């Protein structure tokens, strides 16, 4: 073990030395220096109309990859190769999103990453890594997937950008902007000029600022790991009683089947048309990819009208556990994240209540939800508590007036 730690320390020092010798480390950016060069609105811009910020053609796009220092190289990662999928997993597991107190770190499973990175029409060239030439160690990653996103009623071909991750020892070395520029270049070469992304930090300029809400399922565990606390004048026993979830669903919902997809797509399309920013699932294949129940990845239940055989209601949530850092008793927090929910024959409160029952049966610790869609209407009745984290939504090379969180109909993983 001591030898392993020594090797890791030496490798980390070596990474920093390699970057110190490179041009990328020559100047530390200040403020939003990088974003001020990009086609995004400035923080204090007052936006009245929607539309592209700059119009380019393929002739304007650099044909060769951006230059990296000699010690580093670009790579396209193939999620169908287990060893390359494991490299992405390891980089994210060791270096990706942690909470502000460094108590929890997202743990995206390899199966989840395959689902997130390989929808219909995905391109391997948009799964971009940076390796150390000598050791072949993956030290940076960014991904894009194709999407059609409707903004103010207008469908736009975009990419969803996700999983931007740089090795901890190379933070502040200006590698993230290079990754962003390179994925932008490759996307532009496909004649796509807009993107959607989210971040826990404020950059120029959020199109919406959304809040996370949390519903406790296993109260005792959540207190033991520091995720929540016992409220004043309550005991653990009274807290457990207060947050008890029913054992059985109120309504006859079952997992989505392939036969349900055409009518489920109609239901989903109609529901999403109400929102100012929302995806368009263009084919049945898209819908089946994103909503087919996959163990430890995504769960989708539907209610079907027995006479018409049409889907009338649906809930879905995805599985995103977190590693618990430095807790002697627990090492994983099993969290369900609300995805897309549509209620037409029952209240949205009853529908999500049944989702909570399902999550409880599946042994989740907590159910997380953004205040997008109409979600804020059920938070009080279902005993959700507001979290301390915000999630900012952004559009690249597209400006549109700032939206309320309830006007957003899009969930990015």
From Swiss-Prot:
GO terms for biological process: N-terminal protein myristoylation; protein localization to membrane. Its main location: cytoplasm. Signal peptide: none annotated. The keyword Ribonucleoprotein does not apply. Its EC number is 2.3.1.97. Tetradecanoyl-CoA binds at residues 34-35, 163-166, 174-176. SUPFAM superfamilies: Acyl-CoA N-acyltransferases (Nat). It catalyses: N-terminal glycyl-[protein] + tetradecanoyl-CoA = N-tetradecanoylglycyl-[protein] + CoA + H(+). GO terms for cellular component: cytosol. Keywords: Acyltransferase, Cytoplasm, Transferase. It is found in: Cytoplasm. Pfam families: NMT (PF01233), NMT_C (PF02799). GO terms for molecular function: glycylpeptide N-tetradecanoyltransferase activity. Belongs to the NMT family. Adds a myristoyl group to the N-terminal glycine residue of certain cellular proteins. This is Glycylpeptide N-tetradecanoyltransferase. It comes from Dictyostelium discoideum (Social amoeba).
């Amino acid at each position: 073990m001591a030898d392993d730690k020594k090797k890791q320390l030496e490798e980390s020092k070596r990474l920093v030395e390699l970057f110190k010798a490179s041009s990328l480390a020559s100047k530390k950016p200040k403020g939003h220096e990088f974003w001020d060069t990009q086609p995004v609105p400035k923080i204090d811009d007052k936006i009245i109309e929607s539309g592209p910020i700059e119009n380019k053609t393929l002739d304007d796009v650099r044909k060769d990859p951006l230059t990296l220092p000699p010690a580093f190289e670009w790579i396209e990662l193939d999620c169908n190769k287990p060893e390359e999928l494991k490299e992405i997993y390891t980089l994210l597991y060791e270096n990706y999103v942690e909470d502000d107190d460094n108590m929890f770190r997202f743990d995206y499973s390899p199966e989840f990453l395959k689902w997130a990175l390989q929808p219909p029409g995905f391109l391997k060239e948009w799964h971009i890594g940076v390796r150390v030439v000598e050791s072949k160690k993956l030290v940076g990653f960014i991904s894009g997937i194709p999407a059609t996103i409707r903004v103010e009623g207008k469908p736009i071909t975009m990419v969803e950008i996700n999983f931007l991750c740089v090795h901890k020892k190379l933070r502040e070395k200006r590698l993230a902007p290079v990754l962003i520029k390179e994925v932008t270049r490759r996307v532009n070469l496909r004649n796509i000029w807009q993107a959607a992304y989210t971040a826990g930090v404020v950059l120029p300029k959020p199109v919406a600022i959304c809040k996370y809400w949390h519903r406790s399922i296993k109260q005792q565990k959540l207190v033991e790991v520091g995720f929540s606390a016992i409220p004043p004048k309550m005991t653990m026993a009274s807290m457990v009683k207060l947050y008890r979830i029913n054992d059985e669903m109120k309504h006859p919902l079952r997992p989505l089947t392939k036969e349900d997809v055409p009518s489920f797509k109609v239901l989903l399309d109609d529901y999403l048309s109400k929102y100012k920013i929302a995806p368009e699932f263009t084919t049945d294949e898209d819908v089946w990819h994103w909503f087919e129940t996959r163990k430890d990845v995504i769960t989708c239940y539907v209610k079907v009208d027995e006479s018409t055989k049409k889907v009338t209601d649906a809930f879905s949530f995805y599985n995103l556990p977190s590693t618990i850092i430095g807790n002697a008793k627990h090492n994983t927090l099993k969290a369900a994240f609300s995805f897309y929910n549509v209620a037409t024959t029952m209240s949205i409160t009853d529908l999500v209540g049944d989702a909570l029952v399902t999550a409880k049966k599946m042994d989740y610790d907590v159910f997380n939800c953004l205040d997008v869609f109409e979600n804020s209407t059920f938070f009080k009745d279902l005993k959700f508590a507001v979290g301390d984290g915000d999630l900012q939504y952004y559009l690249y090379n597209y400006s549109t007036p700032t939206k309320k969180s309830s006007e957003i109909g899009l969930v990015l993983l």
